[in-house]
Amino acid sequence: MQTFKKSFLLFSPLFLLLFGCATIQKIGFSQREKLLSAHLKEWENIQIDGIIELNYRGFSFRKNVVLKKMGDRGRIDIFDSGVFGLKPNPFISAYYDSTLFVRLPEQTKFVEINNSSLERELPDLSFIKIFDELVSNKKKILIEKEYRNKDFIFYFSDEMKLEKIELTQENFYVLFDYLKELSKISIFKNSKEIANIQIDKISYKNIKIKSL
């Protein structure tokens, strides 16, 4: 009898774990719909502050970065020093509306990236215009946990958070990692990580993008 009691006490945590896993309820459709709507809403206007590490074609650095998205417009500024330093001038900047403009360290003005070798090296940023399309296709996302068109595939987690964007015509994809909220963005080309952003702060209000 004592042996039975000892065996029961030894295995009871395992029984509880298995029973608990068996009785966990999946998130219902209506709850997932609320989660998806809230998550897509966050991506309408967003500012991300963090540290970017880039290592691509001999171009390597680790610097402060600020990403902003407002509707169909986006901007990224990479700073040579801290954002709140004495001279917080961007080291590299990129602006996207319907066309991509970039200002590199040796340039004083933004240059339109159009039919150039640099354009072929950069991912297609028009995916920032697709979020309205995602909203209008929520039912499809809820069922399949993804949305695709001829250019992109958006993958979503069980919690209805965006976890991957794949560029179907190119060898680029972007991964999104979460703790309580978005904590890291990783960019891959040809299955090799070329950049990642460790996120320090996310804002959803009072976002301003300086036009060119």
Tell where the protein language model's regions lie, with residue ranges.
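Solvent-exposed loop/turn segments connecting transmembrane beta-strands
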Residues: N55-S60, S81-K87, K192
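N-terminal leader/targeting segments and the immediate start of mature chains
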Residues: G20-D72, K208-L212
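Hydrophobic membrane-embedded alpha-helices
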Residues: L134-K138
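One face of beta-strands
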Residues: E44-I52, F61-L67, D72-I78, I92, ...
